[in-house]
Amino acid sequence: MYIHPLNAWENQPEILDFIRKNAFATLYTQAEGRPWATHLPLFLEGKPKGKFVLHGHLAKANSQWKQLAQAEEVLVVFQGPHAYISSSWYTHENVPTWNYLAVHVYGKVRLIEGEELMHHLKSLVDQYETGRPNRVQVETMSPSYLEGQLRALVGFELEIIEVHASAKLSQNRDDE
């Protein structure tokens, strides 16, 4: 992603918070000369030595999971608020633009299964069910039902290698 120097977003705690709050991302891979994309929720986890990983899963029916196993690196895009900025808002001649927040994460994927996949699903459900009335918990679901669901999923852990973040918020414009 091109990032103008004025829009470079380098505050790691803010970026991590943004990823957590905008966890419905787009996962990109490349296969047979063609890009592939899947929209999915991801779960950010801190690891020792300041490392971070993203956990996610795909339907086994989605053949993109096979690309994950073979890819040297994948791209995940997180998008936040965005808005058209009309030049009519200025008192002098100006061009319209678009303001946005975006984070691109590059990483290596490792497929997960079994207990590790179950832990991922539990963490994901717990994250989104916390504070809800009638909270759903994976532990209360029947083992036979869960086993069927797990057979239909392919889980993964993405080790974050590089992050590019842009906060394009009209930093190059004045208030008039």
Map each language-model feature to its residues:
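Binding-site signature for planar aromatic cofactors or substrates
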Residues: M1-E176
